[in-house]
Amino acid sequence: MAIKYIKKGMAVEESAANQEKTRNIVEGILKDVETRGDDAVRELSEKFDKWSPESFRLSDKQIEEIVSSVSEKTLEDIKWAQAQVRRFAQIQKSALRDVEIETIPGVILGHKNVPVNSVGCYVPGGRYPMVASAHMSVLTAKVAGVKKVIACTPPDPKTGVPPAETVAAMHFGGADEIYILGGVQAMAAMAYGSVGMQQVDMIVGPGNQYVAEAKRQLFGRVGIDL
């Protein structure tokens, strides 16, 4: 009886070619945004997400309207989940103690845990709202003491509008600025400082192969998560 394969892994040669293609595409996008700034970000957002609003950043009024469109039950669930994440993050932070000791007269050794000034949190789009990514990036950064947290997420691929549940999770998590912007262009905007964003010190959050490659290439200019 012949073996029927439901799914096969990619051949080594094909995988290498795919990685090279991804690397080149991402490199081109990053260079374009670094060179042309806002214009490049807007063109890329229009190309990949068909999204070109007057401002990529949501105003306080827009956030309020979006959050109000989410069901009360979903909002309660988001707040409940964030309460658990926040509590554990606070316990983790309390375990990171500063240390200082004078080993011999005049010689003081130690270490301090100092939060970075700004973080860019990316929450990917998809078939369903990725609210957990907002809990685990935006919220934990605020617990850590990060002064400015910028959050980015692409528009809903089904409706073409900001994903309400994700925006709500970002907002309740403590995001200082929320942008509806996705993909490599979002990574570049956060790293270089574009469409109203200030350049961040670190970028965190999951994403597809292009987002992951963008973070890899941007490492050094900004810090990234593991």
Stretches with model-predicted labels:
Residues G174-L226:
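Conserved NAD(P)+-binding/catalytic subdomain of aldehyde/semialdehyde dehydrogenases
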Residues A17, K21-G28, R36-D39, K73-E76, ...:
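Conserved active-site and cofactor/substrate-binding residues in soluble primary-metabolism enzymes
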Residues E102-A168:
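Conserved small-residue-rich beta-alpha loop and adjacent elements
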Residues A95-D98, V114-S118, A144-V149, A164-T166, ...:
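Short coil/turn connectors at secondary-structure junctions
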